[in-house]
A protein has these predicted regions:
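Helix-loop junctions at membrane interfaces in 12-TM secondary transporters
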Residues: 71-81
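Helix-to-loop junctions at the C-terminal end of transmembrane segments
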Residues: 38-51, 136
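Structural signature of the two symmetry-related core transmembrane helices
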Residues: 53-68, 150
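A membrane-interface helix-boundary motif in multi-pass transporters
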Residues: 134-152
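Intracellular juxtamembrane helix-capping segments at the cytosolic ends
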Residues: 92-105
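Extracytoplasmic gate region of multi-pass secondary transporters
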Residues: 1-40, 128
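Multi-pass alpha-helical transporter architecture, strongest
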Residues: 150-163
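Interfacial helix-cap and linker-helix signal at transmembrane-aqueous boundaries
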Residues: 14-15, 45-46, 131-140
Length: 163
């Protein structure tokens, strides 16, 4: 949810840092391209580690890339590059989430098990589009909201290790 909220708030985050609306919108599109890169990278890496390792890795990289988005003031080319990195992490995270049940419990009853895992995550994620702007207003900036998202990602990192 942290990565989702920040991703959806990328345009106001980047305009707050001085980008034009058009360039920030292009950056959001390139974040989407980064998701494809992350999914392709996930497909080619070996999957021999313990099941919790991919989740911890993508969650840690989420916290790192969100922190960069929050703290780096510019220039635009660097912010866009960080956005692409965040997209790659988000893309890989999608596949990690999709394979989590099978990696831990096999493919028997995959649909039921994955549904149990995905249901609470889907409910929380549904609030992502509104939580980002609400937190930005409450904290005074989208950068502050992104820093709060880093905190959430770090809490998720602790839980991910014991999943």
């Amino acid at each position: 949810t942290a990565m989702f909220s920040v991703s959806l708030s990328l345009i106001p985050l980047f305009t707050e840092k001085g980008m034009t609306y058009e360039l920030a919108a292009l950056a959001l599109g390139l974040l989407g391209a980064g998701q494809v890169i992350g999914r392709l990278l996930y497909m080619v890496i070996p999957h021999t580690a313990a099941p919790w390792v991919p989740l911890v890795t993508t969650t840690g990289l989420s916290a790192f890339s969100i922190a960069l988005l929050a703290l780096v003031p510019g220039p635009p080319w660097l912010l866009i590059s960080i956005g692409i990195l965040a997209g790659a992490v988000r893309g890989a995270q999608t596949l990690v989430q999709g394979s989590a049940a099978a990696d831990r419990w096999g493919t028997r009853n995959y649909g039921a098990i994955n549904g149990i895992i995905a249901a609470p995550l889907t409910i929380v994620t549904a609030f992502g589009p509104s939580l980002g702007p609400l937190l930005a207003v409450a904290t005074g900036s989208y950068s502050s909201m992104a820093l709060m998202a880093v905190g959430l990602a770090l809490v998720a990192l602790i839980f991910a290790r014991f999943s």
